[in-house]
Amino acid sequence: IMEDEMDNAQLAQLLFPDVDKTPEYYEEKFPYRKLPSKAQVTRMAPSPTGFIHLGNLYSALADERIAHRNGGVFYLRIEDTDEKRKVDGAVETIINVLRYFDIEFDEGAGFPDDAPQNAYGPYFQRQRVEIYHAYAKSLVERGLAYPCFCTEEELEKVRLEQEADKVLTGYYGKYAHCRDLSFDEIKRRIDAGETYVLRLRSQGSPDKEITFVDSIMGEIKLPENIHDIVLLKRDGVPTYHFAHAIDDHLMRTTTVIRGGGWLASVPTHYELFHVLGFKMPAYGHTAHLMKFDEETGGK
C-alpha cells in the first residue's frame, strides 16, 4: 500500500506540477453561506449559446422562487467549457430574457467581478480551471483518478466489441485499458508527447443500486455508476460533470431543479460528490415540457 501511495503522489506531481493549492484552500476561501436556516441557494447554469429553451426558463422560474421565498440566493453561472458552442453576447441575452420575465439574479455572471455579492466567483467555468485542477490532483493522490491515453479509434474499437458482445458500452472494468498502467509506463508515454484525458477510477459495482430522494419525484433507485468517466479533457478543461460538482459545492448550492433528461446522470453525480467528499445538493427533476427540449432541458 505504501508503494501505491508513493506512486500516486508522484503521479499527481507529474500530471499537475504547477498546482500548489489544495481543496482545503478552496473550502476555506468559499465557506458555507451565512443565511437564515430555511434559506436555499439555487442557480441557473446555462451554456452561453445565446438561446434559452423553455425548459431552462421553467427551471429558472422554479429556482428563483425557491431561493427568494426564504431569504436565499439565486445566482447565474456560465457553463462555458465547450468553446464550440459559445456565442458572443450570450450572457447579456440570458440576463435580459430572464429580466423580461421578472426573474432577477442576486449574484454571478453579469455583475462586476468586484461586486460585494460576488464572493463565490468566478462564475465562468473557463476562469475556474485552476480550482478544478486542485481537486483533480487530490483525486490522483488518493488513487481515484488516472490518465488515459486511449485514442478515439481505440475507444471506438472497444465500443464495437461491446456492442457485438451485447454488453454495456463505455470505459469500465476490463475495458478500461489504462486503468492499471504503472507510474513508469505513464511517465514514458507523457515524455514521448502522448496526450491524455484524466478519468475517474470508479468504485461502482454493476450489481449495486443507489437510492436517492428526488425533490419532485420522491425516492428513486438507480444502478451505481461503473464508468471511469472523463474528468479533464486533453486540453485540461473539465467535463461538465466534474466542473458542475465542484461549482455546486463551492458556491454552496443547496437545491437544483433541472429537466428530466438529467435523471440518467444522477449515478455519475452521486459518485463524484461522494469521492470528492461533498454533500450532494437536493435534486428535483421535472418532466419534459416539450419534445424539442429533451436534449438540453435546463441543466
Give the role of each language-model region.
Residues E3-A164, D235, A264-A282:
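N-terminal Rossmann-like or analogous alpha/beta NTP/dinucleotide-binding catalytic cores
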Residues S138, R142, Y146-K299:
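Active-site cores that bind ATP or allylic diphosphates and position pyrophosphate for catalysis
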